[in-house]
UniProtKB/Swiss-Prot annotation:
The gene is Cenpu. Component of the CENPA-NAC complex, at least composed of CENPA, CENPC, CENPH, CENPM, CENPN, CENPT and CENPU. The CENPA-NAC complex interacts with the CENPA-CAD complex, composed of CENPI, CENPK, CENPL, CENPO, CENPP, CENPQ, CENPR and CENPS. Interacts with MLF1. Residues 28-38, 200-218 have a biased composition (Basic residues). This is Centromere protein U. Residues 289-352 form a coiled coil. The modification Phosphoserine is found at S105, S110, S114, S130, S133, S135, S186, S224. Expressed at high levels in glioblastoma cell lines. Up-regulated in GBM (glioblastoma multiforme) tumors. Significantly increased in both the tumor core as well as the contralateral striatum and cortex in gliomas. Residues 101-115 have a biased composition (Polar residues). InterPro entries: CENP-U. Residues 1-72, 87-228 are annotated as: Disordered. Its main location: cytoplasm. Phosphorylated by PLK1 at Thr-73, creating a self-tethering site that specifically interacts with the polo-box domain of PLK1. Residues 158-169 have a biased composition (Low complexity). Component of the CENPA-NAC (nucleosome-associated) complex, a complex that plays a central role in assembly of kinetochore proteins, mitotic progression and chromosome segregation. The CENPA-NAC complex recruits the CENPA-CAD (nucleosome distal) complex and may be involved in incorporation of newly synthesized CENPA into centromeres. Plays an important role in the correct PLK1 localization to the mitotic kinetochores. A scaffold protein responsible for the initial recruitment and maintenance of the kinetochore PLK1 population until its degradation. Involved in transcriptional repression.
Length: 410
């Protein structure tokens, strides 16, 4: 892991040369007294051809730095580290290395300057790595080196924080790579398949500007992550109010500002202020929505009242128009009612008269010799019988009058 972290640094090629020189000088000073000297991974073998190596590197993008993805599964073997180091260096870097080999005094001067710069930077102590962790890491590296590079998932916050530490904070003893059982390949033995694999790894890795920065710890970190920013896209344009826009902008501003503040007490005060203002805005939004709902209901009621009033006016006009017809129908009804009563009375009279005549016929059949006697009760019958007599008398008078006129003319 130390070898992988030693390659993750940003800056210009000059800064990389100074840090590499610092690591090499520190390793030489610390291991001067040791008899068995380790073979440096970054030293080129004598059998390699520099011109062919430069031609291969010119095909790559110049001044391209290798930066592995920020997650715990990105473990590389020393072979892959060596290939990444060779591919990430430019021809100008190789020429700088050759010039350093020719001028050792300049190398020592640059090494002293880099040592002074690194001494000014704060360092933190690292926990020693046990042999068991070394063996497990070697096994993991062997298994990972066989597999094809796959698309990496975004890193978690703890892994990003642990892997994003710069090499300037590490001691010089942790920068030196460990030996493995694999032989050290040269730059000439690098095959096109390895180059294509390296290109795919470079394409997969995210750009440094797009990496997620870990949030600073605070008491309200969980609350800030679970806060819901209002989405105005789902609402209609007529439903969006000024308070919705204000609340959305206020939440975004709070999240951006809280990330920039480092003090925990300030974060707590900002969070309290934010929650109070947010509560007030939400309460105002609810009241405005209730007011809008009441206004809608009031508008509906008023429209219904207007419709009913208009209907009432129409009915009144229709009643006024139909009132004469009602009077005519009333008179017709009264007339028909009178005729109905008269018909009932005449029907009753005829039925009684028929019954009387039937009784008279029965009496005459029983006693035909008996004389008829008339009293007051039989007056209607006498009048009915005298109608023919009175008619004959009137007829005779008319004949007598006409005869008198004829006699006077003669």
């Amino acid at each position: 892991m130390a070898a992988r972290r030693s390659l993750r640094y940003s800056g210009d090629p000059g800064a990389k040369r100074s840090r590499n020189t610092l690591g090499s000088t520190n390793s030489r000073k610390q291991k001067a007294g040791q008899k068995p000297k380790r073979k440096d991974v970054f030293d080129f073998p004598n059998t390699s051809d520099v011109s062919s190596m430069l031609r291969e590197l010119e095909e790559e993008e110049p001044y391209e730095t290798f930066d592995p993805p920020l997650h715990s599964t990105a473990i590389y073997t020393d072979d892959e580290l060596y290939k990444h180091c060779v591919s990430s260096t430019s021809p100008a870097t190789h020429r700088g290395k050759e010039s350093r080999n020719l001028n050792p005094s300049e190398n020592e001067a640059s090494g002293n300057d880099s040592i002074k710069l690194s001494a000014k930077k704060p360092r933190r102590k690292l926990e020693p790595i046990s042999d068991e962790s070394d063996s497990s890491e070697d096994n993991v590296r062997r298994s990972v080196s066989i597999e094809r590079p796959r698309a990496r998932k975004p890193p978690a916050a703890p892994a990003a924080a642990s892997s994003s530490s710069s090499p300037s904070e590490r001691p010089a003893e942790q920068v030196t790579p460990r030996k493995t059982s694999f032989p050290q390949p040269s730059a000439v033995e690098e095959t096109p398949a390895a180059q294509s694999q390296l290109k795919t790894q470079k394409k997969v890795r995210p750009s440094p500007g797009r990496r997620k920065r870990p949030r600073r710890g605070s008491t309200h970190s969980d609350a800030s992550e679970s806060m819901h920013i209002l989405c105005l896209e789902g609402k209609r344009q007529s439903d969006v109010m000024e308070l919705d826009v204000v609340l959305s902008a206020f939440e975004r501003t709070f999240l951006d500002y809280k990330q920039r503040v480092e003090s925990e007490s300030c974060n707590q005060a900002i969070s309290k202020f934010y929650f109070k203002i947010k509560g007030e805005l939400i309460r105002m939004l609810k009241e405005v929505q209730m007011l809008k709902a009441l206004k809608r209901k009031n508008t509906k009621i008023i429209s219904n009242m207007e419709k009913k009033r208009q209907r009432l006016i129409d009915v009144q006009d229709e009643l006024i128009r139909l009132e004469p017809q009602l009077k005519q129908l009333q008179t017709k009804y009264d007339d028909l009612k009178k005729r109905k009563s008269a018909l009932k009375n005449s029907k009753h009279f005829l039925s009684n008269l028929k019954q009387l005549y039937q009784d008279y016929s029965n009496v005459r059949e029983e006693e035909p010799k008996e004389k008829e006697k008339y009293d007051s009760s039989s007056l209607p019958a006498l009048l009915f019988k005298a109608r023919s007599i009175l008619g004959a008398e009137k007829h005779l008078k008319t004949i007598n009058y006409h005869l008198g006129k004829l006699l006077k003319q003669d």
